[in-house]
Amino acid sequence: MILPIIIYGNSFLRKKCIEIDKSYKDINFLINNMYDTMYQAKGIGLSAPQIGLSIRLFIIEYNNFLKQKFKKVFINPIIIKKYGYNLISKEGCLSIPNIIENIKRKNNIIIEYYDENWKKYKQHFNGLLSIIIQHEYDHIEGKLFIDNIFILKNILIKKNFNLNYNLYKLYKLSKLYKFYLIYRSRYRI
């Protein structure tokens, strides 16, 4: 089942999520629906807050250029350590459509989490997988990738989202304004 994705501007995306336990109902059904939603949206990761659930859960499926597939469920993850050099990569987000920005993140992380079978892991990830995990992890912490960009650019992006509807209205008004200018020139008003 395809679930609706919450879009930037909704305060729900800014909430820090809570942990769940084995008694959480229909976790596998939820995870399958999250994968369906992510595939439909052509994403490589999706977090629970993006679909309106304030729980510490995200999924990732990534195929690298070597055609190696990485598919993983992260329940109650905790990033223990971020280290190494800073890696700058382009990031986008299903909750912030049509915005792609260069973001600086650490190249290496150590993370503890449970999988969908409640098996506990403590793993090291680096490179692009580290970036993807940090991006999704930010969601369950109530953060967005645009929080990590240059402050002025951040303001412009936020204003852009708030003004999308206003731009549409301006477009409509511009047609009226052109009509007004023609009318004014003809009748010398």
Swiss-Prot record:
Source species, domain of life: Bacteria
SUPFAM superfamilies: Peptide deformylase (SSF56420)
HAMAP family noted in UniProt: Pep_deformylase
EC number: 3.5.1.88
Cofactor annotation: Fe(2+)
Residues that coordinate or bind Fe cation: 93, 135, 139
Enzyme kind, highest EC tier: hydrolase
Gene3D superfamilies xref list: Peptide deformylase (3.90.45.10)
Protein's name in the database: Peptide deformylase
Gene Ontology BP annotations: co-translational protein modification; translation
Active site (record annotation): 136
Species for this entry: Karelsulcia muelleri (strain GWSS)
Textual note on the cofactor: Binds 1 Fe(2+) ion.
Catalytic activity: N-terminal N-formyl-L-methionyl-[peptide] + H2O = N-terminal L-methionyl-[peptide] + formate
Keywords: Hydrolase, Iron, Metal-binding, Protein biosynthesis
InterPro entries: Peptide_deformylase, Peptide_deformylase_sf
Family: Belongs to the polypeptide deformylase family.
A GO MF term: peptide deformylase activity
Protein purpose: Removes the formyl group from the N-terminal Met of newly synthesized proteins. Requires at least a dipeptide for an efficient rate of reaction. N-terminal L-methionine is a prerequisite for activity but the enzyme has broad specificity at other positions.
